[in-house]
Regions:
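Gly/Gly-Pro-rich "capping" loops immediately C-terminal to redox-active cysteine motifs
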Residues: 35-46, 58, 62-100, 189
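The canonical Cys-X-X-Cys-His
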Residues: 45, 49-59, 107, 122, ...
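Axial heme c-ligation environment in periplasmic c-type cytochrome domains
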Residues: 63-73, 97-129
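Beta-strand-rich domains and repeat architectures in extracellular enzymes and scaffolds
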Residues: 143-205
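Repeated scaffold domains used in trafficking and secretory/extracellular systems
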Residues: 148-158, 197-203, 239-249, 288-303
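Short coil/turn segments that connect the beta-strands within blades of beta-propeller domains
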Residues: 165-166, 206-208, 253-256, 306-309
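Short loop/turn segments that connect beta-strands within beta-propeller blades
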Residues: 183-185, 224-227, 272-274, 325
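A short beta-strand motif characteristic of beta-propeller blades
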Residues: 187-192, 228-235, 276-292
């Protein structure tokens, strides 16, 4: 009897070691089965991900409008239990089908946008560990700043006959341009080269300038008073951006501009008529669950006309910032 009890104790003592070995082997298998990409394949996949996926799934692939696309993730549920998942668990074949045919949750199908080889490549890519992109400092922002036409060399009055109260700035997304269209005559008055995949155009309070931001983080300032409107200044505010607005409170018209980025998660305050960078502010912080988030992206920015403030919306932390300029 004593011998049997002794053997039972040994079996129980060995159980944690066996379980540890089992899970350790599973982790090793996950690492071993993760696809490998050549440098050229990785570069191509990164480009496609930036153009087609990052807007919904996030630069770090932690999920936003779309789901988390990390190889392995864990999530604590309200009842205290832990849920696990990841792209490795889904596997190559299923991932290819999801990317190709979309989901009921709202993701579009990409089988008519990407080739079969590209679908397979993206399924492999999201099973690899995401690279953390570099930061983008105030110095780098300032180094990117260009003034093509200084303020003192710009027109002192409107040099064309456009009705600036009825002018449209229309995004030409794939060519990285905007078309300035006369609302009275419906004529294209000018096509201006701007950043990649223009996301939004904002008119200044005076009606003289148009601020255009592309998804590559390039902000362009267009002067509508010129005989043929053109870019007079530009600056790169980040690697991935969506929003811009200007100061519109009485007495501050056209004085300041602000642009927000998805990556790095921050906003930049600038001189309104030159785009000279004045300040960079990070939006990293805590979510409503008290968890630190490394990628709280700047969504819409709206300028108040009743206070000297911008309303800056931050996605992942759910914060609405009132920034007094």
């Amino acid at each position: 009897m004593k011998r049997d009890q002794y053997l039972q104790v040994l079996r129980l003592a060995a159980l944690p070691l066996a379980m540890g070995a089992l899970f350790g082997t599973a982790s090793a298998q996950d690492a071993a089965t993760a696809p490998t990409l050549t440098p050229d394949e990785k570069a191509a996949a990164k480009k496609i991900y930036f153009e087609r996926c990052a807007g919904c799934h996030g630069v770090l692939r932690k999920g936003a409008t779309g789901k988390n696309l990390e190889p392995h993730w864990t999530k604590k549920l309200p009842d205290g239990s832990t849920q696990e998942g990841g792209t490795l668990k889904l596997g190559q074949n299923r991932l290819e089908k999801i990317i190709a045919y979309g989901t009921e949750g709202g993701m579009v199908n990409f089988d008519d946008i990407l080739t079969k080889d590209e679908l397979a490549l993206m399924a492999k890519y999201i099973q690899t560990t995401p690279d953390v992109p570099p930061e983008y400092s105030f110095k780098e922002t300032t180094d990117s700043w260009k003034v093509m036409v200084p303020v003192d060399q710009r027109p002192k009055k409107q040099m064309n006959n456009f009705n600036l109260k009825n002018m449209f700035s229309v995004t030409l997304r794939d060519t990285g341009e905007v078309a300035l269209i006369d609302g009275d005559t419906k004529e294209i008055r000018s096509i201006v080269k701007t950043g990649y995949a223009v996301h939004i155009s904002r008119l200044s309070a005076s009606g003289r300038y148009v601020y255009v931001i592309g998804r590559d983080g390039r902000l362009s300032l267009i002067d509508l008073w010129m005989e043929k409107p053109a870019v007079v200044a530009e600056v790169k505010v980040g690697f991935d951006a969506r929003s811009v607005d200007t100061s519109k409170f009485k007495g501050f018209e056209d004085k300041y501009a602000v642009a927000g980025s998805y990556w790095p998660p921050q906003y930049v305050i600038m001189d309104g008529d030159t785009l000279k960078p004045l300040k960079v502010v990070s939006t990293r912080g805590m979510t409503v669950d008290g968890e630190y988030h490394p990628e709280p992206r700047v969504a819409s920015i709206v300028s108040s006309q009743i206070k000297p403030e911008w309303v800056i919306n931050i996605k992942e932390t759910g914060q609405i910032l009132l920034v007094d300029y």
